């Protein structure tokens, strides 16, 4: 099975896909629209994109693109915990406290504020396009006193050592990913991964008036 996902590889989306579809043929796309378009064109059978994060809120681009551009059916979802780890090149494994710069996505750095404030008050934070890109950068600069914040898949992918696990502030943080498909067919999952059925509705109100949403739900 060919599955497209929001890349690059070793991101949390990749981790979610790997967990749910360990034997799938995976294709990373640079943007959410590119991933959804690949499903619509038949380039891949399924697409996995983020829809909502417990801390950051809804991913509006996913919602808007599915509503206005490619109204593909949602055939499944993956709810993945967001666990951030501090990782360094093996060269710095035993003196990671000497790190002077921390690389990661801005959201990941914000999610680890307490740990960073305690251990790296004087460190410089460098924002990258993704946590995976941060891990890749650290792996390519082995002799610089730098570290990355990313998931364990990124550490494995780029040969980094995790020196502190679960440095995120809140354990309840998770991201909800949706699985889209061109055909509205039931998605077969392993029984251990099946958690029941869910229906997603798109509702357009005829006009803006007080109590309109209540009328729909009641």
Describe every region a protein language model picked out.
Residues 1-218:
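Domain-level signature for soluble enzymes in the chorismate/prephenate branch of the shikimate pathway
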């Amino acid at each position: 099975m060919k599955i497209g996902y929001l890349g690059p590889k070793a991101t949390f989306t990749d981790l979610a896909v790997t967990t749910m579809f360990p034997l799938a043929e995976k294709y990373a796309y640079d943007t959410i629209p590119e991933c959804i378009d690949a499903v619509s064109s038949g380039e891949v059978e399924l697409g996995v994109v983020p829809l909502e994060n417990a801390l950051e809120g809804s991913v509006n681009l996913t919602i808007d693109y599915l509503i206005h551009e490619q109204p593909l059916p949602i055939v499944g979802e993956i709810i993945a915990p967001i666990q951030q780890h501090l990782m360094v090149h093996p060269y710095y494994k035993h003196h990671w406290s000497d790190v002077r710069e921390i690389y990661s996505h801005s959201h990941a750095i914000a999610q680890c504020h307490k740990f960073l404030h305690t251990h790296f008050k004087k460190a410089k934070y460098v924002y990258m396009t993704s946590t995976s890109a941060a891990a890749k950068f650290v792996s390519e600069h082995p002799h610089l006193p730098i570290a990355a914040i990313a998931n364990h898949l990124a550490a494995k992918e780029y040969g980094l050592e995790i020196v502190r696990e679960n440095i995120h502030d809140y354990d309840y943080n998770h991201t909800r990913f949706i699985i889209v498909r061109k055909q509205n067919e039931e998605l077969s999952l392993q029984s251990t991964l099946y958690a029941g059925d869910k229906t997603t509705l798109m509702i357009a109100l005829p006009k803006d008036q007080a109590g309109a949403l209540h009328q729909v739900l009641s």
